[in-house]
Amino acid sequence: MVKIIFFQAHPDDLEHKCGHIMNYLATKSKKEHIIKIASITKGEFGLPGPQYDKFKGELLGKIRTRELFNAEKIHNILPKNIDFFGYLDGFVPFKKDFIKRIIDYLEREKPDVIFAPEAIYSWYYHMDHINTGKAVFYVLHNKLIDYTPNLYFYTSLSPNFFFGFKKKDLTLTYNLIRCHKTQTWLLKWTMLPYRFTSRYAGRKLKGWKYAEPFRKVYFKNKNLKKNKVSFLIRIFTHFYSSLPWFKAKYPKNLLEDNR
């Protein structure tokens, strides 16, 4: 039986990035796959502005955990198959401790396939996402575990693998993001670009109008050339990753404690 682990930095990250492939694997092929989710944080600070500071922290983390559980009911993924790493939203580090946690987790779970945020050529440069993907990639690239599972990145600017779905199944995505009520302020603005990007990805897959795009990462020497991306993507990523992107308004005492 194939085990697949979906890594995410925050509880709502997978819904319009991997929602369709997750639903297919978990509901239409559930006898053949074990699906798990590894959530690095509980999204404790996922509200905009200091006016919401009284809700941020443990309370919001509990609420967003329930929202995640409600969303995964749609996929028939039970809470027992959702693991939390306990890192704080906005403070996911690319450090030895985090890498060791990833190693221990992969050695224990032994997944055959991993989905994770794009670590290098990403269109979404939130550092929690980037560091999650970087840590997973670092472990596999440096052979820090005794086998190499298949790795697929989502939010990639250079996808090479596509999972097709029908237009009517866009309702699945709407249903998933509606479960994350605390994130409506953000997610309501994402559906228009989501429809555009999934429609564009569908053009890459014969016989489909919509698709979820992923980048399969190759580790065997004979396939390393397949990891090469265009010069334009490399230049764009270099520029894009250097921009001063928005950071959540964390309480001052928390920022001081985490310097």
Q: What feature does the model see in each segment?
A:
Residues V2-I5, V92-R259:
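Metal-dependent de-N-acetylase/amidase catalytic core
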Residues M1-E109, H141-N142, R234-E256:
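Active-site rim/loop-helix segments in enzyme catalytic domains that contact anionic ligands
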